[in-house]
Every structure is written in C-alpha cells, then in structure tokens.
C-alpha cells in the first residue's frame, strides 16, 4: 500500500482509541493505559511500515510482529480490525464467551503470530522468526516493565550475536507498570546505553509522533536501499517515549490506568472526551 497521509494515520489512531475504550467497557475490562500508549506505534507499523496483506495473513513473504507486552491486546485487536484482518464489528465480542478475542493475543485471531502475555518471551520469539528468514523484517513490541525480565536480555544478547539485522525491538517507554514507576521497581536507565552495550543500534523517538516513528521504523532505517537487514548485522532498538493512558487526561500518566473495567457511563464519558479531542485536532 502507498504511504498514508498523517491525517489518515491520525484518524485511524483516534478510531483505535475509541475501540480500546469500548472493549474496556466490556464484561472483563481491559488493560487501558498500556494499550492507549501503544496506539501510534502499532498504527504506523501496520499501516505504513510492515509488508502485510490482510487477505493473506499467512503469506510466506509477510513481515512479522510479536507483541511481547501481550496485555496490550486490545490495542492490537483495534489496529488489526482497522487494517482489515477481521470485521470491526467483532470487537464488540471481546472477552465474551466463545469469542476469539481474549485478554491476551492468541493465534486464532488473524494477524496474531504468537500467543503472548507471559512477559519476557516476545523478543526470543521474534529472534526465531528473524533467524528463520532474513529476507523479511521482524518486530518485537515490548513494554518497559517487561524489560525487567532477565529473559529479555538473554534474547537481546542472542539477537546481536546472531547478526539479526532484520530485527527491530520497539520499546513502549511509558515509564509506568502495575505497581508504579518503572524506576521505583527495577530501574532501567540508562536504557539506551544498556541496549547499545548488548550490540544493538538504538534510536529514541516520541512514540506519539507519526513522522518520528516513520523515520525510525521505515525499511530504509534498518537496511541499505530498503532491504530487510542492516549491512552491519546489528538489530535495532527503538525506544518510543509514550504516555500511559494517552488520550484520556483523567488517567494520562497515572498508574491506575493500567487496568480498567469501565461502566457504561464511564465508557460513554471517555468516548465523549476522545471524540472532542478528535474534533479539535481535525479542525482547520
């Protein structure tokens, strides 16, 4: 597909945020904050960067994305539905009996490559995909709290040792986890230097800025002349600085946004806030 205009990406992101709120108003609620922080990242990847075809979700030449932070599933579902992997109307079945849209991704959902949710395994899984076919790009989208799992760093060491220049890890750096700030749990800083010390090329961007994300994630940013792999064989880590709960001022950058089970009234109010923001941003 041709590169979408920023306005098209923004409109898609607004719809995805509305889908997230709708799913958090379902019977089981959902991980609101960490899904809202992911929206621009996944929107750019699925609509502007990855080589994918929703009509052929198992195509041999497709690019691969593994959502390491599987608790961000409702964002992934919203993006996949908007991209055409399954009907948008199916989002209303999220977490209901018999639905394939569960609280964490499963392979029964078109576009989902691996079941995730047990933190710390996404990068290792992406390593396997990248090693199996170096002619395609592979992405692991990781939470910053997830980086406190030792298995992430074992996988990071292997990525560089194996020369997986077709692999990109995107870190959702919203600085909050279920217990509070990441730096109060197990400090991650200096995060960029940590990745570099493991043999990775590192870029830091505003994770809500479409142009910045495009620049860091576009094929030419990883390989020469748009090829899948970097010539130097180094994997790329993109540290995307984000805001947990982005789009809803009442929960932005708040730990309590981690999980939400919204009442009908709360969901309606949240949707009204999102739609008002969308009108302001789209106004000439």
How should these model regions be labeled?
Residues 210, 216-284:
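Glycine/aspartate-rich loop-and-adjacent alpha/beta segment that forms the canonical ThDP
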Residues 23, 35-161:
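Cofactor-binding active-site loop characterized by glycine-rich and histidine/acidic residues
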Residues 111, 115-225, 230:
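Thiamine diphosphate
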Residues 1-16:
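N-terminal hydrophobic or amphipathic helices/low-complexity stretches enriched
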């Amino acid at each position: 597909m041709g590169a979408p205009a920023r306005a098209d990406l923004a409109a898609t992101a607004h719809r995805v945020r509305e889908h997230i709120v709708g799913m958090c108003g379902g019977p089981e609620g959902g991980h609101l904050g960490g899904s809202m922080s992911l929206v621009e990242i996944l929107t750019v990847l699925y609509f502007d960067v990855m080589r994918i075809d929703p009509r052929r979700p198992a195509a041999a030449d497709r690019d691969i994305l593994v959502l390491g932070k599987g608790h961000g599933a409702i964002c992934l579902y919203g993006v996949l539905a908007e991209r055409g992997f399954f009907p948008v109307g199916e989002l209303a079945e999220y977490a209901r009996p018999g639905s394939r849209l569960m609280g964490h991704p499963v392979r029964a959902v078109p576009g989902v490559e691996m079941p995730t949710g047990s933190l710390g395994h996404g990068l290792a899984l992406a390593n396997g995909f990248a090693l199996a076919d170096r002619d395609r790009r592979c992405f692991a989208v990781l939470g910053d709290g997830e980086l406190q799992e030792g298995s992430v760093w074992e996988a990071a060491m292997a990525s560089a040792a194996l020369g997986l220049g077709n692999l990109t890890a995107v870190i959702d750096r919203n600085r909050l986890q279920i217990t509070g700030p990441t730096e109060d749990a197990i400090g991650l800083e200096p995060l960029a230097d940590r990745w570099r010390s493991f043999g990775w090329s590192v870029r830091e961007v505003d994770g809500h800025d479409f142009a910045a994300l495009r620049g860091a994630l576009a094929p030419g940013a990883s390989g020469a002349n748009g090829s899948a792999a970097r010539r130097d064989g180094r994997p790329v880590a993109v540290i995307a600085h984000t805001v947990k709960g982005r789009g809803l001022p009442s929960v932005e950058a708040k730990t309590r946004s981690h999980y939400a089970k919204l009442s009908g009234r709360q969901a309606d109010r949240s949707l009204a806030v999102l739609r008002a923001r969308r009108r302001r941003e789209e106004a000439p």
